[in-house]
């Protein structure tokens, strides 16, 4: 286990007698990017809570490197509109952070211009960068990013993915990222894990950045995107339970009614 930052083995979580997670095996190593994908209700948020230590599994184990430093970027930040909170004051909620450190973190993510702005006035894309800067202020060995590109168009996704890759390269941290997109993922992902209560399949993404039409559409950020092809050996019913019996015929092709997207 010495090479891993975090390792989950046979993790299961049950709510109201139903399995939300079942027999989950997952690990993240320094410098490794793992992207977690899956349909709504697949257990992605529950898995992130287990990784962060906010939820204890009903069975299985979650091992963390001793004194592991984790930087967490939530999907959204809900702030009372009447609360007088600037971006600087928000970042200084991290212990030991002063203005120079906050400014340096914002510069690293390209958002230094909002340092004195009220958090309520910052745009969605800028707020994502502020949340990423806050995660970096913890000098993390592991970055946990919960849908960092939610609500961002494909060009914006490519730009953010490129930024995350640069941060990984600069800091050498491991990255566990949750994505709402079941097929388009960050090209530098080392492993894609498809979750639907259990690990349905996993593998490497296929780069599409070499396609001239793709490059023309997304420019310099095209290499940040890749397609992930699912290779499921089973199916799920309408309740998300595994349908017993072997999968026969051609490899699974996703349709509009498919639980996996």
From Swiss-Prot:
SUPFAM superfamilies associated with the record: P-loop containing nucleoside triphosphate hydrolases
Record's bilayer topology term: Peripheral membrane protein
Subcellular locations according to the entry: Cell inner membrane
Database matches in Pfam families: ABC_tran (PF00005)
Gene Ontology cellular-component terms listed: plasma membrane
Catalysed reaction equations from the record: Zn(2+)(out) + ATP(in) + H2O(in) = Zn(2+)(in) + ADP(in) + phosphate(in) + H(+)(in)
Similarity-based family: Belongs to the ABC transporter superfamily. Zinc importer (TC 3.A.1.15.5) family.
Function per UniProt: Part of the ABC transporter complex ZnuABC involved in zinc import. Responsible for energy coupling to the transport system.
Protein name per the record: Zinc import ATP-binding protein ZnuC
Species annotation: Pseudomonas fluorescens (strain Pf0-1)
């Amino acid at each position: 286990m010495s090479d891993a930052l975090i390792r989950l083995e046979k993790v299961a979580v049950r709510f109201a007698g139903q399995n939300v997670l079942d027999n989950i095996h997952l690990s993240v190593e320094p410098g490794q990017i793992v992207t977690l994908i899956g349909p709504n209700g697949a257990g992605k948020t529950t898995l992130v809570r287990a990784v962060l230590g906010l939820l204890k599994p009903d069975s299985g184990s979650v091992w963390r490197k001793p004194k592991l430093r984790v930087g967490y970027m939530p999907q959204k930040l809900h702030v009372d509109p009447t609360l007088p909170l600037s971006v600087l004051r928000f970042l200084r909620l991290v212990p030991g952070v002063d203005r120079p450190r906050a400014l340096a973190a914002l510069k690293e993510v390209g958002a230094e211009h909002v340092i004195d702005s009220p958090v309520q006035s910052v745009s969605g894309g800028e707020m994502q960068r502020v949340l990423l800067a806050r995660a970096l202020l913890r000098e993390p060995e592991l970055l946990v990013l919960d849908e960092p590109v939610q609500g961002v168009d494909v060009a914006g996704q490519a730009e953010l993915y490129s930024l995350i890759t640069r941060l990984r390269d600069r800091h050498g941290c491991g990255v566990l990222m949750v994505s709402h997109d079941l097929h388009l993922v960050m090209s530098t992902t080392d492993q894609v894990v498809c979750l639907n209560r259990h690990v349905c399949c996993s593998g490497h993404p296929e780069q599409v950045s070499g396609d001239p039409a793709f490059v023309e559409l997304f420019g310099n950020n095209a290499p940040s995107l890749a397609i992930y092809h699912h290779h499921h050996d089973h199916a799920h019913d309408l309740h998300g339970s595994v349908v017993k019996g072997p999968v026969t015929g051609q490899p699974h092709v996703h349709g509009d009614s498919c639980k996996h997207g």
